[in-house]
């Protein structure tokens, strides 16, 4: 990135593909309506047995802290690929961490703290080739959840001025999302009595009304049930049902 001299930056993983007109479509869009800082496109998941198109659930432009909020709770795709960035977003003070998961998310969180204008185009421009070694197939344990959340919290505090005094709440948004991912994995052991989880519940209680604007009742119910070790089988059953529902909705939307 330090050697890049162009106006824009786009990312391509080594085993993925760009559609022939992806850069043309995205560069044409980034200058519209007074100019955007980021343009996002849809992508195609390519597996051995099938291909599937994934469209962003968000289509309206984002400004201010909207991109940060969406990135922290993963309501949009948080990858670096599938996006076109203005070069200057990567200048002056982006930290890079040797993480095995969430590297793209961490960069996008830091960029989001710069309050970019973001535009979404209804164009399938990126072909994501999924392999058994893909990062979303790697083990995700409680220790890594705690590590990642601590790094995010540190970055949010570093950008506290641009976050208008809401760094603590945005750190909570991230913790709820990442711990929910841990809880939703059936093989994850119960850790509801750990300090990280107890602090999470305490913060969630203080920001209960605010969290309702970002997370569903079902998501918050899972966190409440997770308080009790005996409820772990119920949590696993509910998360399985929610996962099936999400998968069905995606298939019907194609």
For the regions a protein language model found, what residue spans apply to each?
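Nucleotide-sugar donor-binding/catalytic module of glycosyltransferases
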Residues: 1-150, 154, 158-159, 252
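Alpha-solenoid repeat scaffolds
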Residues: 18, 162-163, 206-210
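Generic detector of well-ordered alpha-helical segments enriched in charged/polar residues
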Residues: 68-69, 153, 170-173, 197-201
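Short alpha-helical segments used as structural interaction elements across diverse proteins
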Residues: 80, 172-174, 229, 242
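Short, conserved alpha-helical segments within structured domains
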Residues: 103-104, 168-172
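Flexible helix-coil transition and linker loops at the boundaries of alpha-helical arrays
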Residues: 158-169
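Amphipathic alpha-helical repeat scaffolds of TPR domains
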Residues: 170-183
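Membrane-interface aromatic/basic loop that binds lipid-linked glycans or pyrophosphate carriers
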Residues: 185-254
């Amino acid at each position: 990135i330090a050697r890049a001299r162009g106006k824009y930056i786009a990312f391509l993983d080594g085993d993925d593909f760009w559609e022939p007109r992806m850069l043309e479509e995205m560069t044409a869009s980034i200058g519209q309506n007074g100019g955007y800082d980021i343009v996002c496109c849809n992508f195609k998941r390519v597996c051995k047995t099938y291909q599937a198109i994934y469209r962003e659930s968000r289509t309206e432009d984002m400004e201010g802290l909207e991109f940060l909020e969406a990135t922290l709770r993963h309501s949009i795709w948080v990858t670096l690929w599938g996006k076109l960035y203005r070069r200057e977003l990567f200048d002056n003070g982006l930290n890079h961490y040797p993480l095995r998961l969430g590297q793209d998310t961490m960069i996008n969180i830091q960029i989001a703290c710069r309050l970019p204008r973001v535009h979404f185009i209804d164009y399938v421009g990126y072909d994501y080739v999924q392999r058994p070694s893909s990062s979303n197939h790697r083990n995700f344990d409680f220790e890594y959840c705690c590590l990642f959340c601590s790094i995010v919290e540190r970055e949010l505090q570093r950008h506290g001025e641009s976050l208008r005094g809401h760094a603590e709440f945005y750190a909570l948004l991230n913790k709820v999302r990442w711990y929910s991912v841990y809880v939703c994995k059936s093989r994850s052991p119960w850790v509801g009595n750990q300090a990280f989880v107890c602090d999470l519940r305490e913060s969630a209680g203080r920001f209960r009304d605010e969290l309702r604007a970002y997370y569903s009742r079902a998501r918050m119910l899972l966190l409440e049930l997770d308080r009790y070790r005996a409820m772990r089988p119920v949590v696993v059953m509910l998360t399985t049902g929610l996962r099936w529902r999400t998968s069905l909705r995606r298939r019907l939307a194609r």
